[in-house]
Amino acid sequence: MTIIEGQLVANEMKIGIVVSRFNELITSKLLSGAVDGLLRHGVSEEDIDIVWVPGAFEIPYMARKMALYKDYDAIICLGVVIKGSTDHYDYVCNEVTKGIGHLNSQSDIPHIFGVLTTDNIEQAIERAGTKAGNKGYDCALSAIEMVNLDKKLRER
């Protein structure tokens, strides 16, 4: 039996981050967490590109373009969608989730899902660096692990 696990060493990785400007109070904290996680595990600042998009709905489009135009090892997708009183929340959450999922099934690099979908702003704040940790940081670790898993599979 062979067990393959990814490591959290990120020397010489090139990482793209696409982040939503909508709910920037929270997405900026997710971004800080992601960058912190990447730097702490060996990614250099010059190997991190950050692209801001207007809202969460635009994340899959830009993530696809980033994968097409640059030689990234992974792309981290960060955003926040907070439930309101209309169905708009459901539509945005569904389409962003499907879009990033589609990229993962069609692309040769991992696209990490870091879009918070919460019932209220308090839940979003909790997941952006307070009670529930920082999901941006968690996404950075997921990106590193997935890139390393991919390398190990290719080497077999």
Curated annotation (Swiss-Prot):
It is an enzyme of class 2 (transferase). 5-amino-6-(D-ribitylamino)uracil binds at residues 22, 56-58, 80-82, 113. GO terms for biological process: riboflavin biosynthetic process. Pathway: Cofactor biosynthesis; riboflavin biosynthesis; riboflavin from 2-hydroxy-3-oxobutyl phosphate and 5-amino-6-(D-ribitylamino)uracil: step 1/2. SUPFAM superfamilies: Lumazine synthase (SSF52121). Belongs to the DMRL synthase family. This is 6,7-dimethyl-8-ribityllumazine synthase. It comes from Streptococcus agalactiae serotype V (strain ATCC BAA-611 / 2603 V/R). The gene is ribH.
